[in-house]
């Protein structure tokens, strides 16, 4: 008799535990930790900076784009995504502000017939993640991009990842370094890239 009562009680306990387990499974997930003070405004400011950069490039305002860089800023597109630094190794692009200015002047030179008509581009930037924020406001940001290029009825697509090192200044962010890891960097193309992705 006592054994029957104990078995019944044990079954009820197991059933109650199963019901409780199901109830817990249906509960909403625990909310994420509250962001640090100012995190939303930093995220928004960084996103707006990257979107503005895309608009500047698509508008062919290349001097304005170059001006987004710090005096010692670098634009780097490695040939190999495993590369850790740009100095002294083969790269698709590895340019400081001086070389960027030379590139812009060459493309816009009136005798650069091979570059006419100029191409059109359309950038989409997303998945913007602040990887690191320093006490002075400098940030390291990862994002994804897709660029469509139209030139003489030929359409090309480039996609990949940006890593920006942004320096906070009184007039907003400036680019200390921009790394561009293109997913299709090793693909065969009819002609080379002339300006920045």
Each model region followed by its residue ranges:
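Conserved aromatic-histidine-acidic binding/catalytic patches
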Residues: 38-41, 88, 154
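A solvent-exposed, acidic/Ser-Thr-rich amphipathic alpha-helical stretch
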Residues: 71-141
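Short, low-complexity N-terminal intrinsically disordered segments enriched in polar/charged residues
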Residues: 29-71
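Low-complexity, polybasic segments enriched for Lys interleaved with small residues
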Residues: 2-29, 33
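A generic "alpha-helical surface" signal
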Residues: 44-48, 91, 98, 157
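Short helix-to-loop capping/linker segments positioned immediately adjacent to catalytic or ligand/cofactor-binding
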Residues: 53-55, 111-118, 151-153
């Amino acid at each position: 008799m006592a054994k029957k009562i104990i078995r019944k009680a044990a079954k009820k306990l197991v059933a109650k535990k199963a019901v409780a387990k199901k109830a817990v499974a249906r509960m909403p997930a625990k909310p994420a930790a509250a962001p640090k003070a100012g995190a939303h405004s930093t995220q928004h400011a960084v996103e707006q900076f990257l979107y503005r950069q895309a608009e500047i490039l698509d508008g062919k305002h290349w001097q304005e784009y170059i001006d987004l860089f710090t005096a010692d800023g670098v634009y780097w597109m490695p040939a190999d995504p495993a590369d850790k630094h740009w100095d002294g190794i083969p790269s698709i692009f590895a340019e400081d502000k001086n070389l960027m200015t030379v590139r812009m002047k060459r493309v816009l030179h009136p005798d650069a017939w091979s570059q006419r008509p100029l191409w059109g581009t359309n950038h989409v930037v997303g998945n913007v993640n602040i990887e690191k924020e320093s006490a002075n406001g400098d940030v390291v940001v990862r994002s994804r991009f897709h660029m469509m290029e139209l030139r003489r009825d030929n359409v090309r697509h480039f996609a990949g990842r940006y890593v920006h090192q942004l320096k906070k200044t009184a007039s907003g962010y400036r680019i200390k370094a921009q790394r561009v890891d293109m997913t299709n960097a090793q693909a065969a193309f009819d002609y080379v890239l002339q300006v920045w992705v």
